[in-house]
Amino acid sequence: PPFFFNDTATTVSYTLSLHDALPISTRRSNHMKLMDKAKQAALAAAVKTGLGYLEKDPEVNIPKLMELVDKFVPDGWYESQRNAIRNAIQNKDSNWYKLILRIYELDPGVREAFFTNFIINASLKGSALQEETAEENNCNVPWAILLDPTSACNLHCTGCWAAEYGHKLNLDFDTICSIVEQGRKMGTYMYIYTGGEPLVRKKDLMRICEKYPDCEFLSFTNGTLIDEEFCQEMLRVKNFVPAISLEGSEEANDGRRGEGVYQKVMHAMELLKAHKLPFGVSTCYTSANVDSVSSEEFFDHIIDCGALFVWFFHYMPTGNDAVVELMPNPQQREKMYHKIREYRSTKAIFGMDFQNDAQYVGGCIAGGRRYLHINANGDVDPCVFIHYSNANIYENTPLEIGRAHV
């Protein structure tokens, strides 16, 4: 399952680690391919049936979920992960049990679309097709494609790498659709918008969600453009999840992002929670805000606001005029390493540490190994933080770019 727990049931492995990081040149026999497809089909059936079972009475049926999964999945398949999940969800005092209950407070249609697209399409069905495509073409196939719909932004945050591209670049609607069309053929059903501020293009983004209801779309956003009308659109399309930038207390947040931004973010979260829509928080930690974002108060606050996940990135100076003073020092990074893990095992929110959780995803995931990045000019980067490109989406397809080992 995509969010499978490790053997201690205190942390969660990223969905990106569903299949092991084997060399692309590794070849499997037809028998093994059939076995893998059988596993994927069995898991998909188990997940689909299990989700329907949970809908009837989540609080009563969550502890019984693995009994149902066991009926579909043969002995020995993902056994340690299944046992770890079983141990976690049978404890009603565990943070994971509480997080699952929070998910069942969401709008039912949105929740069903998320489970179907994220678990079945992106992580089970998609994984099998990704592996098959990778072997046939001797290349990496990404689990997720990150793309910048626009370089435009309505804020001017200190140290933001996106500003180095200016504010006039855009991937047009047809180009984004083409990327999604080609990605689906490779088994990629997860698309993540970066920027710029993606919601500058929110009408186009909703049209894309509507056109590809079998894909899940996540967007990093400053949250200031989320309003009542947009919440209604999210309810309509059902497959869009915002990750809202928040960097601690009001003072810490507005010190880098601008005066008044914190209150606008609070308003956006209130709207999303009121409409029972899923969202998370994206936090860039710097030398200036480490104490704020590592505090228990910060975690409790974003949980109260309705966030289901929080994704941490440490500040990385990029570009000629980057503010290097904001880089966290080694002691601050170590502090965040331990704090994120502490709260991940105790709080009803899924915490992720982009730079320091490499152990759960087999190391670096860039270069199409699990993801790649397409900027608003169409340039394809191996990583959102590494702005070097030898390919452009206007000149090559994603598969051709993968074959070139970008």
What are these regions (language model features)?
Residues 30-83, 87, 254-367, 373-381, ...:
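Radical SAM enzyme [4Fe-4S]-AdoMet core and its adjacent flexible, acidic
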Residues 63-229:
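Conserved alpha-helical substructure of the radical SAM core
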Residues 21-25, 398-403:
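Short, compositionally biased segments
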Residues 12, 143, 368, 384:
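Exposed loop/turn and edge beta-strand positions of beta-sandwich/beta-sheet ligand-binding modules
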Residues 173-193, 199-313:
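Radical SAM/AdoMet-radical enzyme domain recognition
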Residues 1-8:
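Right-handed beta-helix
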Residues 20, 153, 157-160, 364, ...:
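Short cysteine clusters
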Residues 8-22, 405:
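Short, small-residue-biased leader/transition segments that mark boundaries at the very start
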